[in-house]
From Swiss-Prot:
This is Pyridoxal kinase. It comes from Mus musculus (Mouse). Keywords: Acetylation, ATP-binding, Cytoplasm, Kinase, Magnesium, Metal-binding, Nucleotide-binding, Phosphoprotein, Sodium, Transferase, Zinc. Belongs to the pyridoxine kinase family. Catalyzes the phosphorylation of the dietary vitamin B6 vitamers pyridoxal (PL), pyridoxine (PN) and pyridoxamine (PM) to form pyridoxal 5'-phosphate (PLP), pyridoxine 5'-phosphate (PNP) and pyridoxamine 5'-phosphate (PMP), respectively. PLP is the active form of vitamin B6, and acts as a cofactor for over 140 different enzymatic reactions. GO terms for molecular function: ATP binding; lithium ion binding; magnesium ion binding; phosphotransferase activity, alcohol group as acceptor; potassium ion binding; protein homodimerization activity; pyridoxal kinase activity; pyridoxal phosphate binding. The modification Phosphoserine is found at S59, S164, S213, S285. Gene3D superfamilies: 3.40.1190.20.
Amino acid sequence: MEGECRVLSIQSHVVRGYVGNRAAMFPLQVLGFEVDAVNSVQFSNHTGYAHWKGQVLKSQELHELYEGLKVNDVNKYDYVLTGYTRDKSFLAMVVDIVRELKQQNSRLVYVCDPVMGDKWNGEGSMYVPQDLLPVYRDKVVPVADIITPNQFEAELLSGRKIHSQEEAFEVMDMLHCMGPDTVVITSSDLPSSQGSDYLIALGSQRMRKPDGSTVTQRIRMEMRKVEAVFVGTGDLFAAMLLAWTHKHPDNLKVACEKTVSAMQHVLQRTIRCAKAEAGEGQKPSPAQLELRMVQSKRDIEDPEIVVQATVL
């Protein structure tokens, strides 16, 4: 029997829908992981709806929760997973917790989605306070092992713009030098040979040989765009990448193929259901576009590969 693998996931929580911990816990549990969730916020629903209500966890409250685990000697983890955060002091507290957990378990893997912003029509903009960037760059990324920025976030962290695949890999090398051995740029506006209906994702994994030298595996994936606005996809991606890199630690190609293929199955099912609910010619609402997670259990568990990665 395989040993227990436990994840501490510090993310947002919604009562209705699938973002943050709600998007991460189910797939991780389906794939055999124990998940301990700290809810950085508790909202009625995600903020893409017309209204939402709820509470935000303060950094001191995060510290209290962690201390509770510590005094009971149950703060033993194999992975830490974090996503969207708006507060600088909360993010700094996360770093303190990760550092302490790594002192206890030097093999702990920290998976971080450095959520800061995105590009729309070629223009990048941040949707978190700007004072989070130096915390991510100088404190979070150096303790992270796997990071999943989009192109804009990779540019922010490295201080360099990406105009080509070559420049993207130069940026990823810079990010490797900052700390993480695995960097996946989850989406970019780089051109696809298959046309403008496709998004490019890039992955780079630095592996250490027994003699101390390193070898880097690089991959490229082309994914068909889905014409809808989904929320929670980045959280789902990071959780599944955690799971599949655990199961395929030296094969980023397979880990990314399984992650992205499962994502495609979830998104296609979601858009089919949303369109059917909305009715012909009607635009689906945020509630109708909530990820069909439970219905996609089999695809999450054993995804049919529908997106191939090219090793470069």
